Amino acid sequence: MENKKRTFMEDLKMILKGIGIWQKITPTYVPYLILDSIFTCLKPYFPLYMSAEIVNELVGTCDLQRLLILAVIAVAGSFVLSLLSRFSHGKLEAIYELFYTRHQAYLFNAANHFQYEHLEDPEVALSRTRIHSVMNATSAGLPKVIFLTSDILRKLMNVILSVVLTISLFQVAPGEHSGFFGFVNSPWAALVLVAVVAANSFISVKLATRSISKINGALSELAPTNNMIFSYMEAQGTDMHIFKLNSIFLSEFKKHMMRPKWVQVLESAMTSQATGKHFLNLVMKIVVFIFTAAKAWIGVIGIGNFILYQGTVQKFVDAVSELGSNIGELRDNNQYLEETFAYLEMPNNMYKGTLAVEKRDDIDYEIEFRDVSFKYPRSEEWVLRHVNMKFKIGDKLAIVGENGSGKTTFIKLLCRLYDPTEGKILLNGIDITRYRYDEYMGLFSVAFQDYSLFAFSIAQNVAASENIDEDRVVSCLNRVGLGEKVAGLPNGVHTYIGRDYENDGVDFSGGEQQKIALARALYKDAPFMILDEPTAALDPIAEAEVYARFNDIASDKTSVFISHRLSSCKFCDEIAVFHKGHLVQLGSHDKLVAEKNGKYHELWNAQAQYYTDKTA
């Protein structure tokens, strides 16, 4: 993924935007973060400070009563801080865990508002996969914003506490000192120490940022492949077991995930950072030890403070270097935030219409395709070309044609999942793009061939809502021929589909699931009913039953019916025949089958020949 160059202010705005989304997802996070940062910072400094006070008392007046009080304060204070730190940290950990679930829900909710073309767009799907994969592999994106912000807040508090506790280290002792001790007692020594600390921090930040960038880059490239490989384990687990594909799977895993290139990048990045950091820490410890020892020798600080400053200055150095590293990592993380924001803010141009769909008592609606042509986004190939057609409420229209002829695309345009590339679709003479999108969509009940049922109750699947009219659900199930089966289940319509959420859920056959999808289309009770291969998964007896009930199912609605089985289209008022994206014929079954040179006649005879041969 390309890491664009941004100014510090641009990065800061993006980070603050990420924190804002975090706050929306987990509103209780910030208060616990502040508390945890305070307790976490005080926890190591408090024992250091109390130890220094105890040592100073031991080498000073050695008052036993004061020593006892200091010891009690040290032990009790450390215990209380430890309890408070564990409490706040436990709360944060729980929020962290909750965040991942809510983060998924947040992305899912955003996707619910996408245009349909974005849901089908491979680039959008790849972006969604990258967001999930990188987050799972490295916590990059929104999770890392808050993790690093938490660290930065703690490091800032560490720096402030360190400065407050070590301020006396830079005082100048009275009296004359020559040579090295004279230099240590001068302001120049303080400047040199500050310069050494700054140089140490700068180099540490550079090492860490370079290492993190390499590691994140390698892991982000590996993450989609990693997710894909492990998804195969879930989806194809049965085949792997039956056909003994484990060795092939393991070989592919090693080939893709254990490439020398990635291993070398990760090892090199981690080793160089660890070695560099170890060397810098050693140099810093030597410098701090010499400086504080010299200050103690000339009497600027006491022996107890020598111990305090040794620990405090080192913590200051660590905090500053890690602070810079965190800031660098946070800025590097913005490349993942940018993709997350682009995904969350994907525009939806379907909601520009402002007209209300007329609520007619006579439900008299007419749909017209006027010279409609269409090609999918990122494609130059026309899928539909110059389609002209009208149909009114109450008509039963069949859409037929060979695979790839444009049937399903025609339905997607009718339902306004896509808008035409050229031409217009009119509802009662008005361009459908001028209507409010939700109201126009409310005109259609659809049962697609590639329908989806969810691991919820039958009632929830049929009603597509938590506000369920149970009698209506039962009625719809009866109309599609599944009422008796559902009534015989222990929990009736409240039986769960599958066992994802409930152990007593039921696994329905493909045909039964298709009937549930049909019942869902009926439950919506919209003026237009669209059925895409509604009997594809049914056995012949069940198929005949559905066709026998079709007049009841469609009743006074406009039904648009897609099928490869032309015999099932005979009951329709009109049949639209598509071929290579063109509407080539329109008429009744008797009319079209009589046109000897027509496409419908060709398709009808081809299927009739198949059944004749099978019978023979």
Task: Briefly describe each language-model feature range.
Residues 415:
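Helix-to-loop junction immediately C-terminal to a conserved catalytic motif
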Residues 382, 420, 426, 483-516, ...:
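ABC-fold ATPase nucleotide-binding domain signature/coupling loops
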Residues 424-426, 441, 459-503, 547-548, ...:
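ABC ATPase nucleotide-binding domain helical subdomain, centered on the C-loop/LSGGQ "ABC signature"
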Residues 217, 244-245, 288, 307-346:
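Cytosolic ends of transmembrane helices, especially the final helix of ABC transmembrane type-1 domains
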